[in-house]
C-alpha cells in the first residue's frame, strides 16, 4: 500500500520513513508546503465571503417580495438553504483547519464537516432532478395540462432532503465513514479503504449508483425529451411566442445549472471513483484536494446563475439593495415579459 491507514484516517503517503502522523493531532507539512495550506485557507475564505451574502440575499429578497414565492422558486431557495449549511457547517471548519495544516477538530468535527459537505452536494443534485422533472412535465406535457403547484414543490423539497440524508447520514450511523482527504484539511466519504467493519465498499457502490448515476440519468432523459419537444413546438407554432420564450428562458437557466453542477462535481466523482477502484495505488494529496475544493464552489454558482438569468428576481434584488428603488429604472411590475404558466418565473 502506498498510503498509511490509521484507525480513523488514511494518509496518501507511505510511512516507510516514519514521518506520517495522525491528521487529527499533527500538522501535515510532509504532504505539502506551508504556502499550499495557506492557499487552501485563502480559497475557503473567498468562498465564505462570497457564499454567505449571495445565498442569504437570495433568501432575504424572496421573503421581502411575495411575487417571488412561487412553487418553482421553492426548489431554488432549497439550494440556497443547503449552500448556507455548507458555508457555516463546512467552509468555516475547513478554513480553520487549513490555517493549522491538519484537522484540529478531531474525528467528531470531521464527521460534521463531511456530513454538511455531502448533504449540500446531494441536495443540489436532487434539486436539479426535481427541476428537470418539473421542466419535463410542464413543457413535454406527458400528463396533459399538468400544473406544478405548491404541493408538488413541497413534495419535491421533501424528496431532496430525504435522499440527501439517506446518503449523508449513513456514515454517521456506521455504514462507511468520514475521514480527512487530500491534504487532510477537509473530510469526505472514505473512498480509500475497503474497511470491512463499516461495509465501506457497499456504501460507495450504493452512493455512486443511487446518488450520482441514477439522478444524472433522470436529468439527461428529461432534458433530452425537453429539447426535442421545444424544437417541435417551435416548428409547429403550438404555443404563443411569449409562452415559448418564457419556457425557453426558464429551461435554459436550469440547464446551465446542471452544466455548472457537472463541471464542479464530475471531477471530484471521477477522482473518487478512480481511488476506490485502485485502492493502494500511488497518488499524491493534491490529486484529491483540487477536485474536492473545486466542488465546494458549487455553493456560489447556483444563486449567481439564478440572479443573472431571472429578470424578475434581479429587479427585486436591486430594489431591495437600493432601499425600494431600482437604479436601472426597470420596474418588474411594469414589465411586459410573460411568465410561464406553471413556474411563474419571468424570463431574463
Swiss-Prot record:
Superkingdom of origin organism: Eukaryota
Annotated binding of Zn(2+), by residue: 201, 279
Cell compartments where the protein resides: Membrane; Cell projection, Cilium, Photoreceptor outer segment
Topological domains, Cytoplasmic: 62-73, 134-152, 228-252, 307-348
Record-level Gene Ontology MF annotations: 11-cis retinal binding; G protein-coupled photoreceptor activity; metal ion binding
Post-translational modification: Contains one covalently linked retinal chromophore. Upon light absorption, the covalently bound 11-cis-retinal is converted to all-trans-retinal. After hydrolysis of the Schiff base and release of the covalently bound all-trans-retinal, active rhodopsin is regenerated by binding of a fresh molecule of 11-cis-retinal.
InterPro entries: GPCR_opsins, GPCR_Rhodpsn, GPCR_Rhodpsn_7TM, Opsin, Retinal_BS, Rhodopsin, Rhodopsin_N
Predominant location category: membrane
Gene Ontology CC annotation, any one: photoreceptor inner segment membrane
N6-(retinylidene)lysine, modified sites: 296
PROSITE patterns with a match to the protein in the record: G_PROTEIN_RECEP_F1_1, G_PROTEIN_RECEP_F1_2, OPSIN
Residue intervals passing through the bilayer: 37-61, 74-99, 112-133, 153-173, 203-227, 253-274, 287-306
Side of membrane Extracellular, spans: 1-36, 100-111, 174-202, 275-286
CDD domains: 7tmA_MWS_opsin (cd15080)
S-palmitoyl cysteine-type lipidated residues: 322-323
Modified sites of kind Phosphothreonine: 335-336, 340, 342
Annotated positions of the Phosphoserine modification: 334, 338, 343
Motif mapping: 'Ionic lock' involved in activated form stabilization: 134-136
Disulfide-bond pairs as recorded: 110-187
Glycosites: 2, 15
Metal-binding found in the keyword field: yes
An example Gene Ontology biological process: G protein-coupled opsin signaling pathway
Function: Photoreceptor required for image-forming vision at low light intensity. Light-induced isomerization of 11-cis to all-trans retinal triggers a conformational change that activates signaling via G-proteins. Signaling mediates the activation of phospholipase C. Subsequent receptor phosphorylation mediates displacement of the bound G-protein alpha subunit by arrestin and terminates signaling.
Family: Belongs to the G-protein coupled receptor 1 family. Opsin subfamily.
The name this protein goes by in its record: Rhodopsin
Organism: Tursiops truncatus
Gene encoding the protein: RHO
Amino acid at each position: 500500500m502506498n498510503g498509511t491507514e490509521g484507525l480513523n484516517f488514511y494518509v496518501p503517503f507511505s510511512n516507510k520513513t516514519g514521518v506520517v502522523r495522525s491528521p487529527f493531532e499533527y500538522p501535515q507539512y510532509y504532504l505539502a508546503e506551508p504556502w499550499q495550506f495557506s492557499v487552501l485557507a485563502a480559497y475557503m475564505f473567498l468562498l465564505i465571503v462570497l457564499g454567505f451574502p449571495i445565498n442569504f440575499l437570495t433568501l432575504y429578497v424572496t421573503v421581502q417580495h411575495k411575487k417571488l414565492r412561487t412553487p418553482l422558486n421553492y426548489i431554488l431557495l432549497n439550494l440556497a438553504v443547503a449552500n448556507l449549511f455548507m458555508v457555516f457547517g463546512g467552509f468555516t471548519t475547513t478554513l480553520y483547519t487549513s490555517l493549522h495544516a491538519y484537522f484540529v477538530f478531531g474525528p467528531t468535527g470531521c464527521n460534521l464537516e463531511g456530513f454538511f459537505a455531502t448533504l449540500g452536494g446531494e441536495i443540489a443534485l436532487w434539486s436539479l432532478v426535481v427541476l428537470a422533472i418539473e421542466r419535463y412535465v410542464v413543457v413535454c406535457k406527458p400528463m396533459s395540462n399538468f400544473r406544478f403547484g405548491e404541493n408538488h414543490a413541497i413534495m419535491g423539497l421533501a424528496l431532496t432532503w430525504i435522499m440527501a440524508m439517506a446518503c449523508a447520514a449513513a456514515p454517521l450511523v456506521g455504514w462507511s465513514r468520514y475521514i480527512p482527504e487530500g491534504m487532510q484539511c477537509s473530510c469526505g466519504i472514505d473512498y480509500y479503504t475497503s474497511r470491512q467493519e463499516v461495509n465501506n465498499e457497499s456504501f460507495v457502490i450504493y452512493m455512486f449508483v443511487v446518488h450520482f448515476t441514477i439522478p444524472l440519468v433522470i436529468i439527461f432523459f428529461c432534458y433530452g425529451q425537453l429539447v426535442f419537444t421545444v424544437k417541435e413546438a417551435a416548428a409547429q407554432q403550438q404555443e404563443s411566442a411569449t409562452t415559448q420564450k418564457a419556457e425557453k428562458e426558464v429551461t435554459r437557466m436550469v440547464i446551465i445549472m446542471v452544466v455548472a453542477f457537472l463541471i464542479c462535481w464530475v471531477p471530484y466523482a471521477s477522482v473518487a471513483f478512480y481511488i476506490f477502484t485502485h485502492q493502494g495505488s500511488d497518488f499524491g494529496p493534491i490529486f484529491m484536494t483540487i477536485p474536492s475544493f473545486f466542488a465546494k464552489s458549487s455553493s456560489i454558482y447556483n444563486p449567481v446563475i439564478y440572479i443573472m438569468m431571472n429578470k424578475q428576481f434581479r429587479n427585486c434584488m436591486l430594489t431591495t439593495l437600493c432601499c425600494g428603488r431600482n437604479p436601472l429604472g426597470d420596474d418588474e411590475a411594469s414589465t411586459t415579459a410573460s411568465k410561464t404558466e406553471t413556474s411563474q418565473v419571468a424570463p431574463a
